[in-house]
């Protein structure tokens, strides 16, 4: 077997990118001479993440699947275009493996891999698979799951399925809390409340926290806040903190999340599959506000995995802003004041954590390559 090329496909949100990067790191560590190449979308979040990796990459014109006739036609056309681009790139290599992780970029690349006869793997981190993974399962040889319950959502696949957890980048296995504290200028004598809407930010979480700032000032002597806003809300959130006596660090984005989680005592955030896995592996008690607009409510199911073991609580992101703020404060205030309960929740995270997922998937991909 000559040099193997591993083609990773996913993008549009961090939840489709970070698991692939985690596995790519492990493949590279085990097989240093392997080529790592990514297919990703045109969205800004993809560019922001991939520009720092040093991996080869190709941008695809693929778009999401919608019921609107014009958007549906666009999906079909860009799917075909993306499949052709991927086929040309993959066909240049002597030996290849394709790995998809959902998102509208993954489908055409998995299809390209199947048409070329190379091994195809899927990484599915949500309990309920998205449309891309549901579609791509027909072309997959192996599917790697975060949750055992996901098996029932792939009834027609011929692929072998493995429940391994959600792959996280290697830094999560060896985080450095002191690095994050120094990097962000935090007070090592104060607890850290992390507010995050994942890679793209959350306007509704941002607004809720900003409305709670007067109440949060009661905890200013013992707590500090790291607030990751996303690009769109940064200026407004920064302004909201002005004039408060809260110690805070407001950023639109932060790349060292493993180190930051290690320094965090409580997190408020969404419950995407990657976020839930990060909370668990990092051992951080969480207040989860599942994204309310997914039809399958998969973020509620993800967060449920933390509440089942006592590692997190769920707050409904209801439509009424006043009600949302009141519900959040009802959970947040007692948790900030109860060190013992937070310690119990942090310990409970171990029951949900699967820190070796990336390593296990990488080992299987290398075995798949040997059959090519």
Where are these regions (language model features)?
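Donor-nucleotide binding loops and adjacent catalytic segments primarily
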Residues: 39, 44, 49, 53, ...
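Glycosyltransferases and closely related glycan-assembly transferases
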Residues: 28, 85-98, 106-121, 134-138
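An amphipathic, basic-hydrophobic alpha-helix
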Residues: 65-97
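Acidic donor-binding loop of glycosyltransferase active sites
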Residues: 94-97, 262-277, 284-285
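A short, well-ordered alpha-helix in the C-terminal region of glycosyltransferases
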Residues: 341-355
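Active-site-proximal region of nucleotide-activated glycan assembly enzymes
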Residues: 35, 56, 114-178
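Conserved nucleotide-sugar phosphate-binding/catalytic loop shared by glycosyltransferases and other
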Residues: 3-11, 33-78, 164-167, 231-233, ...
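C-terminal alpha-helical cap of glycosyltransferases
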Residues: 354-372
């Amino acid at each position: 077997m000559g040099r193997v090329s591993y083609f990773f496909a996913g993008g549009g949100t961090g939840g489709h990118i970070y698991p692939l990067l985690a596995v790519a790191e492990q493949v590279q560590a085990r097989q240093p001479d392997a080529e790592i190449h990514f297919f990703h979308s045109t969205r800004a979040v993809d560019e922001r993440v991939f520009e720092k990796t040093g991996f080869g990459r190709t941008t695809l014109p693929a778009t999401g699947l919608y019921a609107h006739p014009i958007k549906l036609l666009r999906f079909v056309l860009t799917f075909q275009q993306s499949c052709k681009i991927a086929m040309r790139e993959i066909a240049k290599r002597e030996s290849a493996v394709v790995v998809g992780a959902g998102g509208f970029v993954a489908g055409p690349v998995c299809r390209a891999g199947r048409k070329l006869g190379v091994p195809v793997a899927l990484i599915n981190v949500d309990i309920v698979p998205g449309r891309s993974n549901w579609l791509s399962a027909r072309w997959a040889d192996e599917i790697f799951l975060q949750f055992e319950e996901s098996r029932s959502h792939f009834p027609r696949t011929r692929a072998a399925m493995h429940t391994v957890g959600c792959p996280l980048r290697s830094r999560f296995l060896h985080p450095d809390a002191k690095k994050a504290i120094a990097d962000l200028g935090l007070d090592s004598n104060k607890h850290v409340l992390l507010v995050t809407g994942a890679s793209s930010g959350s306007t509704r979480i941002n607004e809720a926290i900003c409305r709670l700032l007067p109440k949060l000032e009661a905890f200013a002597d013992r707590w500090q806040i790291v607030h990751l806003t996303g690009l769109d809300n940064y200026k407004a959130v920064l302004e909201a903190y002005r004039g408060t006596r809260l110690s805070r660090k407001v950023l639109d984005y932060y790349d060292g999340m493993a180190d930051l989680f290690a320094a965090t005592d409580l997190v408020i955030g969404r419950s995407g599959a990657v976020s839930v896995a990060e909370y668990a592996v990092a051992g951080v008690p969480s207040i989860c506000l599942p994204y309310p607009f997914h039809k399958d409510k998969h973020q509620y199911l993800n967060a449920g995995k933390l509440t089942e073991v006592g590692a997190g609580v769920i707050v409904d992101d209801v439509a009424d802003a006043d009600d949302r703020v009141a519900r959040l404060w009802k959970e947040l205030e007692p948790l900030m004041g109860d060190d013992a309960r937070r310690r119990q929740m942090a310990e409970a995270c171990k029951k949900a954590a699967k820190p070796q997922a990336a390593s296990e998937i990488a080992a299987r991909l290398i075995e798949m390559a040997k059959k090519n």
